[in-house]
């Protein structure tokens, strides 16, 4: 089974840049001037156009085609039973651009896109799932606080999506989350400083990943009495060209995997890259190095840790990770206590738990 990510890219990811198609399919407020920006963030992907009838028509045709083709009973073309709508929409200026737009307005349109995809997909497969895509910025923080109409806190998007879905008729949207470490360059998420264990945490990374299912388990978020599902559809542990950071990444993966296994509403945990990517903003997120000819290189330590999960060798890997990270920290993060509330702010703006 495959979960697909639906993207609306004007110039990347194989776009043929058909002017007639783009005139209706690209969001009317897309920041064309930021496609190759050297001064500020780059607009890689457009939001889906929910503002015109023509835009919605192209979008529905796109989703209908994929849903019909990839949910056939004979699985002739394979199976695709879930759609992630756009990418990291709380950082919309880069990954789902609709220009300058307050979070409430952006999320209203985004919820429409999720709803249309849900309607189209459910016609062909009753168990199809639709996912909202979020990065690790959660509450009262975002990628660039000076640009509040371009970058949002993930929790605000989730809360507005609930508001609009209840207003217009509830449906079972879910969340595709990216719990990267707080600094993507450093693989040791277990040493993250920003994540806390309340609903008001600034970030949700693997360190406090338990907060996300706890937040969605609140009664107001339930759909027909059941919590919304979560997939961890993108994450990775950067290596810096040295043995120590590679070992950090391997041990981090082991702990992350143990934490996620304990969370019933998380259905999938998939890595961002199998092989290091030269164009990944300086990050090396693969399980393997990359050769000079761009073929897969030597496996990193994380490769062997992943290989040993859910095998008799897993217990030894857990022992290694516990010793490397520190038994007290490892055990505390494996069984954290979540405070179901906002936390108590102190004078520095941090939270006391």
Positions of PLM-derived features:
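Substrate-binding cleft and catalytic face of glycoside hydrolase catalytic domains
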Residues: 1-144, 182-183, 276-281
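Noncatalytic carbohydrate-binding groove/subsite architecture in carbohydrate-active enzymes
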Residues: 13, 59-62, 67, 73, ...
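Aromatic-rich peripheral "rim/lid" segments of glycoside hydrolase catalytic domains that contact
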Residues: 34-36, 41-43, 94, 239-353
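Short glycine/proline- and charge-enriched loop/turn segments
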Residues: 42-43, 98-101, 191-196, 286-288
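Helix N-terminus capping/helix-initiation residues
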Residues: 52, 101-102, 153-154, 208, ...
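Short, solvent-exposed loop/helix junctions and linker helices
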Residues: 52-56, 202, 206, 296
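Extracellular serine-dependent O-acyl
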Residues: 80-86, 225-233, 262-277
């Amino acid at each position: 089974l495959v979960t697909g990510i639906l993207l609306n890219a004007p110039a990347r990811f194989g776009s043929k840049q058909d002017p007639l198609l783009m005139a209706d399919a690209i969001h009317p407020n897309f920041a064309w001037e930021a496609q190759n920006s050297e001064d500020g963030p780059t607009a890689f992907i457009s939001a889906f156009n929910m503002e015109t009838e023509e835009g919605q028509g192209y979008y529905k045709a796109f989703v209908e085609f994929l849903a019909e083709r990839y949910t056939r009973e004979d699985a002739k073309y394979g199976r695709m039973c879930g759609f992630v709508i756009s990418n990291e929409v709380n950082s919309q200026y880069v990954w789902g651009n609709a220009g300058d737009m307050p979070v409430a307005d952006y999320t209203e349109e985004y919820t429409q896109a999720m709803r249309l995809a849900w309607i189209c997909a459910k016609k062909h497969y009753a168990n199809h799932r639709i996912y909202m895509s979020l990065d690790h910025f959660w509450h009262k923080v975002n990628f660039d606080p000076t640009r509040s109409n371009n970058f949002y806190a993930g929790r605000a998007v989730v809360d507005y999506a609930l508001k609009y879905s209840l207003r217009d008729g509830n449906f079972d949207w879910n969340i595709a989350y990216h719990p990267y470490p707080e600094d993507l360059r450093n693989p040791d998420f277990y040493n993250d400083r920003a994540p806390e264990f309340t609903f008001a945490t600034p970030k949700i990374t693997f360190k406090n990943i338990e907060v996300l299912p706890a937040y969605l388990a609140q009664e107001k978020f339930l759909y027909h009495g059941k919590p919304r599902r979560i997939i961890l559809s993108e994450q990775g542990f950067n290596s810096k060209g040295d043995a120590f950071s590679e070992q950090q990444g391997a041990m981090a993966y082991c702990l992350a995997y143990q934490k996620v296994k304990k969370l019933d509403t998380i259905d999938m945990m998939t890595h961002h890259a199998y092989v290091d990517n030269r164009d990944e903003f300086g990050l090396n997120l693969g399980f393997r190095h990359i050769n000079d000819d761009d073929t897969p290189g030597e496996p990193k330590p994380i490769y062997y840790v992943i290989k040993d999960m859910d095998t008799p060798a897993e217990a030894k890997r857990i022992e290694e990770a516990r010793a490397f990270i520190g038994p007290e920290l490892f055990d505390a993060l494996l069984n954290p206590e979540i405070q179901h509330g906002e936390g108590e702010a102190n004078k520095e703006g941090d939270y006391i738990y």
